[in-house]
């Protein structure tokens, strides 16, 4: 127990970030590096401690996630495996401590049901909260891209 608090304290100190878009982009990239490496301590740091809302790319559901504890992070993230890279990252500050991120993920993904997608592509939207000296992931939505589509920057809506 004491080891966990010490580890979380050290991790929090090392991962603390300024409240700006540049720091959020670095946090987003570190989060996905941690996901790919199954670095549960870092993943736990980036999870919002008030819980989260997740939109699944494999089903048509939104899920309400309770506030995480370290065991729940290990339980979930040990069931999925990823080797994905975020691209075309766009960050929009919504209020003083709330940010929207829009980006694409591409690579390989193993779902919790065991299914593997070696050509995984998703359009992702997240809401990040700046709390406790760093960015925490509160809202996660993943929309699979059709195989023939490729990630691209956000463009103006066509008004034809």
Task: Outline where the language-model segments fall.
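Sec-dependent N-terminal signal peptides
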Residues: 4-15
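A short, structured loop/turn motif at beta-sheet edges
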Residues: 91-100, 128-135
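Hydrophobic/aromatic beta-strand elements that line small-molecule binding cavities or substrate pockets
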Residues: 73, 86-92, 105-107, 123-129, ...
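Low-complexity, intrinsically disordered terminal/linker segments enriched in charged
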Residues: 11, 129-132, 136-160
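Short, low-complexity N-terminal intrinsically disordered segments enriched in polar/charged residues
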Residues: 14-46, 155-160
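A solvent-exposed, acidic/Ser-Thr-rich amphipathic alpha-helical stretch
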Residues: 21-22, 39-94, 118
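Generic short beta-strand segments
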Residues: 50, 103-110
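Sequence/structural signature of outer-membrane beta-barrel proteins
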Residues: 108-112, 146-147
